Swiss-Prot record:
InterPro entries: Spider_toxin_CSTX_knottin, Spidertoxin
Tissue distribution: Expressed by the venom gland.
Protein name, entry field: U10-lycotoxin-Ls1a
Localization per record: Secreted
Keywords carried by this UniProt record: Disulfide bond, Secreted, Signal, Toxin
Signal sequence, start to end: 1-20
Modification(s) after translation: Contains 4 disulfide bonds.
Gene Ontology molecular functions: ion channel inhibitor activity; toxin activity
Main localisation: secreted
Coiled-coil annotated spans: none
GO CC annotation: extracellular region
Similarity-based family: Belongs to the neurotoxin 19 (CSTX) family. 09 (U10-Lctx) subfamily.
Length: 77
């Protein structure tokens, strides 16, 4: 029984260390990289910009990409 408890504690410690390492050493998302799931991870001087996507009047998604700050994109006609 003690072995099971000890093994559980060791596994918990390992998982906690892995999660802490991922947060402290996280890699940033480069220019034009997708940031839909992690909008705060774009590299310095880059913003995560999102837009709504519609097909036949129905919203089908909200894709997000890392873009340069202060850049405005316009739709081509």
């Amino acid at each position: 029984m003690k072995l099971i408890i000890f093994t559980g504690l060791v596994l918990f410690a390992i998982v906690s260390l892995i999660e802490a390492e991922e947060e402290s050493g996280r890699v940033c998302i480069p220019l034009n990289g997708e940031c839909s799931k992690s909008p705060d991870k774009c590299c310095d001087n880059i913003n995560c910009d999102c837009y709504l996507r519609f097909e036949k009047g129905v919203q089908t998604g909200r894709p997000c990409f890392c873009t340069e700050k202060d850049v405005i994109f316009e739709r081509d006609e």
